[in-house]
UniProtKB/Swiss-Prot annotation:
Its main location: secreted. Residues 19-24 form a propeptide. This is Factor V activator. One of its GO terms (cellular component) is secretory granule.
Amino acid sequence: MVLIRVLANLLVLQLSYAQKSSELVVGGDECDINEHPFLVALYTSSSSTVHCAGTLINQEWVLTAVHCDRKNIRIKLGMHSKNIRNEDEQIRVPRRKFFCLNTKFPNGKDKDIMLIRLRRPVKNSAHIAPISLPSSPSSPRSRCRIMGWGKISTTEETYPDVPHCAKIFIVKHAWCEALYPWVPADSRTLCAGILQGGKDTCEGDSGGPLICNGQIQGIVSGGSDPCGQRLKPAVYTKVFDYTDWIQSIIAGNTTATCP
């Protein structure tokens, strides 16, 4: 109890590092059409509803969260508006999916990562291009970018036609442990948000990227309900901890051990 109180006080002090905003992906603005060529939309053959997002990391591979997995999944690349089609949009289906078997944490939140090999490579275009894997881990207070077609309201089921983007900050992992009991100390996750609340990923943003310094550092995994609460940053899969596994799979070692 004392630890939680101390951490809560530290969180309040840390607010000085976060920019106050009245904005509610909850809390974002419409993304520029040219700023997310790596962002992909996931849906199924039986529904046109975007249930998750993902990230193109090369012409043949997409990174997302394992809890976004569905049967008959479809991957749309180059999309901005859900209703107005870009000329260079492409649709792909998985050739194979790779994920981490997790027996230690049955809820799956500790290893919420899935690597999808596309049946056919995509072609780079004005609105389709991969983003780099992290060359080093992110540090607390790093400024990052979130984006997705998820809910933009904490009180209503409001989903945008175009992806929304927002700037948030990495926070210390110890705070995640105190706030979320299901995040263990040895978890390969990170937390990020605006500690005053108001900016956050939300339902429908799962699997999407946390971009820091032009690299994907996180995958949207979980967080508070409702989204965007004060002192409750969201939880992201820490991509840096999986880079060796990702690169091994892509190189052809399909039996590579997940960390």
